[in-house]
A protein has these predicted regions:
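Surface-exposed patches in mature extracellular/periplasmic domains of secreted proteins
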Residues: 117-119, 152-159
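Short N-terminal helix-initiation segments at or just after the protein's N-terminus
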Residues: 16, 30-34, 162-177
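Alpha-helix N-capping/helix-start residues
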Residues: 99, 154, 207-210
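Proteolytic maturation boundary segments
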Residues: 1-72
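Hydrophobic/aromatic residues in well-formed alpha-helices
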Residues: 51, 105, 139, 157-160, ...
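Histidine-acidic residue clusters that define the catalytic metal-binding segment
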Residues: 28-45, 185-214
Length: 214
């Protein structure tokens, strides 16, 4: 590499290119075409005997079933000294059941060609699943097992805590994350739960115990 060996040029001089010829005048705005039609699917509603409300859309193009189960809760049920508890709980629900280790649970889900994810928000904790229609009952059985018979393994709990703290430290180095967290505090106030990071903070997450999750 020889410094200064490059050719000199004037950046103010713009190159000229021959324009591609057109069969019409591009300076004239074309007429609008027909308004596109949008077919909005019908949403059906139902209620179970236990009071659960169901909202659904039918689509027979592919043999798949996708469903979300929302449970009232999430960040708004936390206390200020336990920020991030809902997120830790949701993450730990994916880490095995009373009858299955993490690996066994993952294998059971994969054998069905399904995916099951649990995440928490401000007002709800949501279990989201996608599966083949023929495996719907088996997938739903796994969801039930994850919710009602969680493993709550201490080693997995420690790993989830460490991963969450690592994410929080990454956010501290991200201008977008810092801006988002600061914006929420300014909008809702420092004493309002909605102004807090859904993951909590490094101090609060470190103080959460497995008994808090249970």
């Amino acid at each position: 590499i020889v410094i200064g060996a490059e050719e000199k040029f004037d950046p103010k001089i713009a190159a000229s290119y021959k324009k591609t010829p057109s069969s019409f005048d591009r300076s004239i705005e074309p007429d609008y075409g027909e308004t596109a039609s949008l077919a909005v699917p019908d949403v059906y509603k139902a209620s179970l005997e236990n009071g659960l409300k169901i909202y659904g859309i039918e689509n027979d193009e592919v043999p798949l079933v996708r469903f979300n189960l929302s449970i009232k809760g999430g960040q708004l049920l936390e206390s200020m000294d336990k920020l991030g508890l809902a997120n830790l709980t949701a993450s730990l629900l994916e880490k095995g059941t009373a009858n299955k280790t993490v690996t066994e649970l993952e294998e059971a889900i994969q054998e069905l060609g399904a995916s099951i994810n649990v995440y928490s928000g401000t007002e709800n904790t949501t279990i989201s699943a996608t599966t083949l229609a023929k495996n719907y009952d088996k997938t739903l059985a796994l969801v039930k097992e994850m919710l009602l018979e969680p493993r709550f393994d201490s080693n997995e709990f420690d790993l989830v805590k460490k991963a969450t703290i690592a994410r929080l430290r990454q956010q501290e180095a991200s201008p977008n994350a810092v801006a988002r967290n600061t914006y929420n505090e300014l909008i809702y106030g420092k004493d309002n739960m909605r102004g807090k990071n859904n993951l909590g903070n490094t101090g609060s997450v470190s103080n959460i115990t497995l008994e808090d999750v249970k």
